[in-house]
């Protein structure tokens, strides 16, 4: 569990440090080949923790993709448009307190990333328990 949480933290930190990396990773299918040693290390840690090789690779891929997708969304909410407003300001103007999704301050921080990571971890635990 902590391995996957830490991996999400590292992916998020990397996306924060290098603006635009998030979308670049999604646009170039071979991007992951540049971090093969890192991937192997994470997968090996997960295998040592009890996951099968395929499960471990899937778990990291799921966490990584989720983290990157969340970062893309948060970056869009932070971005200032031609009208001088941020994405979150535009969303606030287009929603009400009765909308399905009501903007919250956390949306421009990490959004719901941590909840999603915990959801994935719980699901993986159930699969491993079988």
Segments predicted by a language model, with ranges:
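Hydrophobic alpha-helical bundle segments that form small-molecule/ligand-binding pockets
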Residues: 36-85, 127-129
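Hydrophobic alpha-helical connector segments
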Residues: 1-36, 63
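A generic helix-loop boundary/linker signal
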Residues: 5, 32, 53, 103, ...
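Residues at helix-coil transition
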Residues: 9, 16-17, 68, 122-129
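C-terminal peripheral helix-coil segments that are non-catalytic and often amphipathic
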Residues: 76-130
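Soluble or luminal CAZymes and related metallo-dependent hydrolases
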Residues: 3, 34, 38, 108-116
